Amino acid sequence: MQDKIIVKGARANNLKNIDVTIPRDKLVVMTGLSGSGKSSLAFDTIYAEGQRRYVESLSSYARMFLGQMDKPDVDYIEGLSPAISIDQKTTSKNPRSTVGTVTEIYDYLRLLWARVGTPHCPKCGKEIRQQTIDQIIDQVLSLPEGTRIQVMAPVIRGKKGEHAKIFEDAKRSGYVRARVDGNLYELDEEIKLEKNKKHTIEIVVDRLIIRPDIQQRLTDSVETASGLTGGLVVVNLLREERDLTFSQNYACEDCGISIEELTPRMFSFNNPFGACPTCTGLGSQLKVDPELIVPDKSLSILEGAIQASGWNNIRGDGISRMYFDALAKKYHFSLTDPWETLPEDVRSIILYGTGGEKLELHYDQPRGKGVLYQPFEGICNNVERRYKETQSDASKRELEELMAECPCPTCKGKRLKKESLAVTVGDKDIDALTRMSVVDELQWVDRLELTHQQHLIADRILKEIKSRLGFLQSVGLGYLTLSRSAGTLSGGESQRIRLATQIGSSLMGVLYILDEPSIGLHQRDNDKLLATLQNLRDLGNTLLVVEHDEDTMRAADYQIDIGPGAGIHGGEVVAAGTPEEVMANPNSLTGQYLSGKKRIPVPETRRPGNGKSLKVIGAAENNLRHIDVEFPLGTFTVVTGVSGSGKSSLVNEILFKKLGVELNRMKVHPGRCDRIEGIEYLDKVVDIDQSPIGRTPRSNPATYTGLFNDIRDLFASTQEAKSRGYGPGRFSFNVRGGRCEACSGDGVLKIEMHFLPDIFVPCEVCKGRRYNRETLEVRYKGKNIADVLEMTVDEAVEFFAPLPRIRNKLQTLCDVGLGYVKLGQPSTELSGGEAQRVKLATELSKIATGKTIYILDEPTTGLHTDDVRKLLEVLQRLVDSGNTVVVIEHNLDVIKCADHLIDLGPEGGDGGGTIVCTGTPEEVAACRSSFTGQYLKKVLEK
């Protein structure tokens, strides 16, 4: 078997026809500056080719659904294994996905509960026993005399198929009717069912009217129905249109409540047989939030306290004013009174309506005047009704801004119906177990006491559960709960979950390609992750890891450094070999940082701040334990702590959202805290995250930074443009006039392929240049507008050197390390780190007020150590202007450069949520109880 993967002539994106040799069955780390071409080689070339070859081996029928995959721009690749990509972009946003379902641990838990669970009565909590035929008959005969019923046998429950044989057998056995999916059919009819839909079929065994003399006939019918289904009988009350379900298997003797036989689907919130009927298994509902309806309680109704669309403009004589005048008159309040001073009952009536009580509405319209008498439904009820009734997506989005996710009133956020939650294993229902952390669940499995018979049934299931929980703990995710929604996980967490799932699969001979698995991981947990990667390698797999973490580089068997620069300055193999060989290579920037020849310096002094501070009092979101936290203003503050310690809850959920509501008028629901003091010292909060700067190819760095407006003004001021009468709008590719109309200024045409992905092809008219011929004839210094958009930032700085307004904005893009990016590069092609730096550059180019607080969550994601150096210089510049920067970070190079640290912990999940220590990096390094301090001490001593 070949012992290496050989790549010849890779040219994807910025790769310069490179040849690479990768040893098989080794841990290979790919390094280099951000934008140097690592992902182009790892994902766009090696993974894409591995995937394409696998898809080609499938049948034409399977390929029809997967689509034709393009061959990457490479001469050939030898020795390639089936490739599995574990990146950070495929986090599921489906609200039905949880940590438990993604890892498949929940499937094993459902099986455990179905096989050894003890059912209880959902009403009284008593353990449920099997129900006899006599008990079923007694309950049916207790119905009021004259009740019309039909006894039915549910032979099929929620199964896909046409089920033609079921109908034939029933007809042959002499049955006349069947209820299919809630509708009654004669069996003489031709009943056609959709093959790929789930159906429920109930054979009507008998129809009866409740009388004392029907006992024998009812007994025969119930026994027949029970015999057809293995113990399950449905009695349908015809007039009331409701069903009574009886089971010979489980029923409460006191309440007469029976539940069906325990099956795994009964514990699935993604199946109608297990899901809560109110929220259909989501655990939450969208409800109008009064806090978002009235964000500023100091305003009066007349001043615009109410921010719901349709109710926020009452200065005229419209319908909303008519209602408010009537409410004020009836309940004796003034529209000029601040909302917070209105009596509680008045506020409740305005929000939730008058019930049946009618208002006296005086109208004065051009058509006439008069009085109407009608009730007021309340603003919350009005918004909710409009949300349900509207067909417009835009209206729905607007109304959703006034709504928040609230726990389902029926299941209290537990997702399952009450019958499913009444089944226990080891005195716990399945929801209670999934709300425990992975570490606690492992202890629960070890302590679980079962009978000998239950052990015989459950041992194999428990072994699978225990091993998968162990894998999660081994990748540093012991603080997570299985009930945690997959959409709330960070990129690093979701990647490590999929990594744990892959270890559980125990495949060998596979090529795994990972994208920065250490993201979001504290240094303490890094060793666990490395041990996991080495374990995966030792199974007989090749691991190709794109990484910037020094510990991972040192642990590698082989390292490939791509560079030397980024973008057009990268795309070459600078060094390849063992980490020691890369360190010895003078051309490798990565090697210089790894060997310590280059390093990010520790600041000589720490800023004390401007004497003012922001205080979060009583922070209690998620696992935070009513802590008080002080953020000194005018400093560079970093919030640290192990994964799951509460950093994001404190900074993103409480601090950012609360400041956003107060300063930016954002419509969000801040995390729980008593109050925040010191907001008056700030005038703006800016969250600089790694989300895209735009969702379409029309958005690019030039448009986002505002640079493109200046460039269009410049072209409009040229002599040629003036003589033709062209204004700045002529040079926009978003409006008619100067753009190419064949592609509407996109430069590409989208061809819809229906069930295949859409294909983009260059526009044949403008050849991808976006503008029409006349517009491109206008030139500045020999370049037209399309040429300028094709320039890199470095080239543009030189080109626009005599124009300070344009040059300064371009210089800020250079300062954040984006000199290699093209001005017109579509935002969809920028990485998360690049998008974040475009936002930083935009903020840098604004005039500083000195009263802004910037919040960044792990800004070093995707950044090389040299890029981190540039990022730190930019952040320090923001603080030098009098602003405050608050960063969540694990990167020790960032932590050591902070003015002030807030270390949360000591552990993750339930073991976290408290302040371990605060102070300068030197003070935290001296704190023995701080895990961050222990690692920081080593870095500061270098």
Predicted features by range, described:
Residues 1-942:
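Conserved phosphate-binding elements of NTP-dependent enzyme cores
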